[in-house]
A protein has these predicted regions:
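Beta1-alpha1 glycine-rich phosphate/pyrophosphate-binding loop at the start
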Residues: 3-67, 71, 75
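Short, hydrophobic/aromatic-rich segments at coil-to-beta transitions
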Residues: 90-95
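The identity of the second residue at the extreme N-terminus of proteins
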Residues: 1-2, 80
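Conserved small/polar residues in nucleotide/adenosyl-binding loops
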Residues: 97-99
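A conserved beta-strand/loop element that lines the FAD pocket in flavoprotein oxidoreductases
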Residues: 72-84
Length: 99
């Protein structure tokens, strides 16, 4: 599998980075996430306080993460779940384990 840009981690920062890269014109983007769903640690943060700066409203962690998940799903960004990066060689080649 080839990609112009690979983002390791499908939390909000990884998803935001992938979406920003797409806005800058990078066409072939892949997010690799070790968990069974995108969203990262925020899926466990049930308290309010997220999203005020980005979305102009107060959200729980899962709500905030879901906003980014929906943006990724509506974009051309691809993602692989249950996938761990175990090695990077020469800055270009990744060894993956699909769990």
């Amino acid at each position: 599998m080839k990609a112009e840009l690979v983002v390791i981690g499908g939390g909000p920062a990884g998803m935001a980075a992938a979406l920003a890269a797409e806005e800058k014109g990078i066409k072939d983007i892949l997010i690799l996430e070790r968990d069974k769903e995108l969203g990262g640690i925020l899926n466990q943060c049930i308290h309010n306080g997220f999203g005020l700066h980005t979305f102009k409203e107060e959200l729980t962690g899962p709500e905030y993460a879901n906003r980014y998940v929906e943006k990724v799903k509506a974009s051309r960004v691809k993602y692989l779940l249950n996938t761990m990066v175990v090695d990077v060689q020469g800055g270009k080649y990744l060894s993956l384990i699909h769990i």
